From Swiss-Prot:
Database matches in InterPro entries: G6P_Isomerase, G6P_Isomerase_C, Phosphoglucose_isomerase_CS, SIS_dom_sf, SIS_PGI_1, SIS_PGI_2
Active-site annotation: E354 (proton donor), H385, K505
Protein name: Glucose-6-phosphate isomerase
Keywords: Cytoplasm, Gluconeogenesis, Glycolysis, Isomerase
GO cellular component: cytosol
One Gene Ontology MF term: carbohydrate derivative binding
Domain of life: Bacteria
Enzyme class: isomerase
Family from the record: Belongs to the GPI family.
Organism: Cupriavidus metallidurans (strain ATCC 43123 / DSM 2839 / NBRC 102507 / CH34) (Ralstonia metallidurans)
Pathway(s) it belongs to: Carbohydrate biosynthesis; gluconeogenesis; Carbohydrate degradation; glycolysis; D-glyceraldehyde 3-phosphate and glycerone phosphate from D-glucose: step 2/4
Length: 541
């Protein structure tokens, strides 16, 4: 039990002391500059200022002691060693191998995984080059202008986020990459109506090649090709697969030579580094994809070797533990001050909440501490005009991670100065607040003062990068992967399974049959009434 650890109980007592001192007091003291130096880190092209947190040097020391007692170093080493740390599925969780050098000593069950990984990477490079250069053609001999990635969850969120983040690197001449994930037919229909079937390529991305949403969309897209004149024997020019299930790929009609494999020791939310990232290589080129891997590898090396107190993923993870478990803060906000990173919060939602949204420990007993916070956010400055009111003055305190590139894009560089000014100002305002005395001195009407007071003392991290490059983006993603893993270790849960998504899938099958025909199943009264209402509407449609 995490709460049985000595450091956990020491942190409880320490919290009772620290909560009496607001951050404003620490920043008003003579050693404020030293505080910033002490509570900042640089790694893999990222700079972290975590001085605007409710911590002292003693807090940090106790948090690092908790990480030690919880077994973070040992579990980290077990992951890199390829041990079956995904205990409930009896698998390794070796996504770090996907971005490692060919001679890296990564093994699963005693066998090196590196030759297979780098063979797939070689094939991805060749394929991306052929498509992007126009050598790969559709059924009419024309080059590919549009690519549709069909997947869901980890087969969609990661590649979609990266393609959006690196869109400034895409060749304006194409190919353009589109993403379809939802089984709601509107998404696929609206995507396809803009495309030329003769010049479109579909990537069907599913580990098992049985995922309901993905296969429904893939079948509908195959029908779309056939309706628009692509012959059955030419479909192979318009489909490739990313999967572990060769037989299902062949049964669907995709040439097995156009299948890019990955492995069951890669979790979906950790898979963008594998052939699941084929859409990235097609969108921005394989060299950029390779740079993404290099950045992640740099963060892997930092995570594996840096002392805990200088280890960026560990420090960020333990700050999250501090707020979730000792300050009872149930949510956290990701605020990237970069439109390019606007999908990063959605990516983190899956990464953190699917990984650590668990209530059972590794030994099957209930967790005796709160686990994953609700993760939310949008790109700045949009968030300032939506939910920042609550973050500044609401009754719940929300820790915020700000992320910002320092160097402006070539277009409208003056806008970037305004963007950074707002980013830094929000973090300062959260920490500093505004007192009734300040407002009174400024001549504010007495009746308004209570409504304009900012308590301050609200925590945030600031993550900065020079430019949003593939290398730095890779490091940023890997940082949050490892942060998530470390928190799972402390909570003594398995961050690499997702059994919570299974029951809904099982129950959906008979309900689909009921909605489509006359079958009936036993349901609670509410669900039965919903099905009956839907059947009446469907019958009229």
């Amino acid at each position: 039990m995490p709460t049985d650890l000595q450091a956990w109980n020491a942190l409880r007592q320490h919290h009772d002391v620290v909560r009496e001192t607001p951050m404003q007091q620490w920043f008003a003291e003579a050693g404020a500059a030293q505080r910033v130096d002490a509570f900042s880190l640089e790694a893999s092209g990222l700079y972290l200022d975590y001085s605007k947190n409710r911590i002292t040097g003693e807090t940090l020391a106790l948090l690092m002691k908790l990480a030690e007692e919880a077994g973070v170093p040992a579990r980290r080493d077990a992951m890199f060693a390829g041990e079956h740390i995904n205990a409930t599925e009896d698998r390794a969780a070796l996504h770090v191998a996907l971005r490692a050098l060919p001679d890296a000593p990564f093994k699963v069950d005693g066998a090196s995984v590196m030759p297979a990984i780098h063979d797939v990477l070689r094939r991805m490079r060749e394929f991306a080059g052929r498509v992007r250069s126009g050598v790969w053609t559709g059924s009419t001999g024309q080059g590919i202008t549009d690519i549709v990635n069909i997947g869901i969850g980890g087969s969609d969120l990661g590649p979609r986020m990266v393609c959006r983040a690196l869109a400034h690197l895409a060749d304006p001449r194409g190919p353009r990459v589109h993403f379809v994930s939802n089984v709601d037919g509107t998404e696929l229909a609206e995507t396809l109506q803009r495309l030329d079937p003769a010049r479109t390529l579909a990537i069907v991305c599913s580990k098992t090649f049985t995922t309901l949403e993905t296969m429904a969309n893939a079948c509908s897209m195959r029908d779309w090709f056939l309706r628009h004149g692509v012959a059955e024997n030419q479909l192979a020019r318009h489909f490739v697969a990313v999967s572990t299930n060769r037989d299902a790929v062949v049964d669907f009609g995709i040439d097995p030579n156009n299948m890019f494999e990955f492995w069951d020791w890669i979790g979906g939310r950790f898979s963008l580094w594998s052939s699941v990232g084929l859409s990235i290589a097609l969108a921005v080129g394989f060299d950029a994809f390779e740079d993404l891997l290099l950045g992640a590898r740099a963060m892997d090396d930092h995570f594996r070797t840096a002392p805990l107190a200088q280890n960026m993923p560990v420090v960020m993870a333990m700050l999250g533990i501090w707020y979730r478990n000792f300050h009872d803060m149930p949510t956290s906000c990701m605020a990237p001050y970069s439109t390019s990173l606007e999908l990063f919060p959605a990516f983190l939602q899956q990464l953190e909440m699917e990984s650590n949204g668990k209530s059972v420990q590794l030994d099957g007993r209930p967790v005796d501490a709160d686990t994953a916070p609700v993760v939310w956010g949008t790109a700045g400055t949009n968030g300032q005009h939506a939910y920042f009111q609550m973050i500044h003055q609401g009754s719940q305190i929300v820790p915020v991670d700000f992320v910002a590139p320092l160097v402006p894009p070539r277009e409208l560089p003056g806008h970037h100065v305004k963007l950074l000014a707002n980013c830094f100002a929000q973090a300062e305002a959260l920490m500093r607040g505004r007192s009734a005395e300040e407002l009174q001195a400024a001549g504010v009407d007495a009746a308004r003062i209570p409504h304009m007071v900012f308590e301050g003392n609200r925590p945030s991290n600031m993550l900065l990068m020079e430019n949003l490059t593939p290398h730095v983006l890779g490091a940023l993603i890997a940082l949050y992967e490892h942060r998530t893993f470390v928190q799972g270790i402390v909570w003594n849960i398995n961050s690499f399974d997702q059994w919570g998504v299974e029951l809904g899938k099982i129950l959906a099958r008979p309900i689909e049959a009921e909605l489509s025909g006359n079958a009936t199943e036993a349901h609670d009264a509410s669900t039965a009434a919903l099905i009956a209402r839907a059947r009446r509407s469907l019958a009229r449609s």
